[in-house]
Amino acid sequence: MQCPSCQNTDSRVLESRSADTGKSVRRRRECLNCDFRFTTYERVETVPITVIKRSESKETFSRSKLLNGLIRACEKTCIDNQKIESIVDEIEIQLQQRNMKEVSSSDLGEMVLGQLKGLSEVAYIRFASVYRQFNGINDFVETLETFKPDKKLATVI
């Protein structure tokens, strides 16, 4: 690692610790030439993911865009910001584990809905109404039907 003060490439690591909730390593270093101390961060390089939109246009996956959509859907529900962050983290992990370079916006939306379904019906409906472009009350009713318990199961119990 090159020293920012003298550009010497010899340094020693004084301290290493996990940073950014385990997604990076923070290292405190000291230059062996001028004794200047500096901090470096080491992260796993991830493959950028491209989102293919309905219009067939492509854009780079934006964590903040997904996070903002979830925050809007979860407003005034019992879902806190930490849980919303963990949903976005989980979706990013799934995309990386699948080694996907491209994902359709519809697949991404279904991943979000899958995470929301067990958490909050209100947040699910809000997100679905934007993502699925609801045009009227029938779209809401149709989606709400998925939350009704199975009638066969209800009669058995």
Curated annotation (Swiss-Prot):
Zinc finger (unnamed): 3-34
Residues covered by the ATP-cone domain: 49-139
Record text on cofactor binding: Binds 1 zinc ion.
Needed cofactors: Zn(2+)
InterPro entries registered for this protein in UniProt: ATP-cone_dom (IPR005144), NrdR-like_N (IPR055173), RNR_NrdR-like (IPR003796)
Listed transmembrane segments: none
Compositional bias (Polar residues): 1-11
Top-rank taxon: Bacteria
GO biological process terms, semicolon-separated: negative regulation of DNA-templated transcription
An example molecular function term from Gene Ontology annotations: zinc ion binding
Keywords: ATP-binding, DNA-binding, Metal-binding, Nucleotide-binding, Repressor, Transcription, Transcription regulation, Zinc, Zinc-finger
Function: Negatively regulates transcription of bacterial ribonucleotide reductase nrd genes and operons by binding to NrdR-boxes.
Statement: the UniProt record of this protein carries the keyword DNA-binding: yes
Pfam families referenced in this protein's UniProt entry, alphabetically: ATP-cone, Zn_ribbon_NrdR
UniProt family annotation: Belongs to the NrdR family.
Protein name, UniProt field: Transcriptional repressor NrdR
NCBIfam families: transcriptional regulator NrdR
Signal peptide start-end: none
Species this protein is from: Prochlorococcus marinus (strain MIT 9211)
Region feature Disordered, mapped onto this chain: 1-21
